[in-house]
């Protein structure tokens, strides 16, 4: 089983997913890998509350202590029990934000996870990553990203909530005018 977890939408869902299999994924398909592309907690068709780069909890003490690692653990358990013809081995792969989820998969310490492949993962948004560059907040990038990721979503859905348009080529003037 090869898992990719994403905040960006796992659709097309079900058997239509084959349209996503391009490039190196076709090699895995020829080798009979079972693909799972999962919307993360609180995004698109997944229930719960989405938290941007939800922190890892090393010593979970209560059932309410959830993080992306515990979600990967639970997903892996469910897949092993409900997916026919699996060999009991799981890999988790992703790049950028999905790479962060691959790291969390490794931290889940599920014994069936044999490989984690984080490619250019989001790691520390406060130092040297997309939101902050050496501690300086990247307002334009953060604003654009938050406008797409942090919109309210009261129920699981395939529909996108429209963002408030702010069409602007001169972002300095846009923020200056906004106050």
What feature does the model see in each segment?
Residues 46, 96-97, 120:
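Catalytic nucleophile serine of serine hydrolases
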Residues 83-97:
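Alpha/beta-hydrolase fold nucleophile elbow
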Residues 97-110:
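Short glycine-enriched nucleophile-adjacent loop
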Residues 1, 31-35, 86-90, 111-115:
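Loop/turn elements at helix/coil->beta-strand transitions in domains of secreted/extracellular proteins
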Residues 1-81, 131, 137:
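Cap/lid segment of the alpha/beta-hydrolase catalytic domain
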Residues 21-22, 30, 55, 62-65, ...:
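Accessory cap/linker subdomain of secreted extracellular hydrolases
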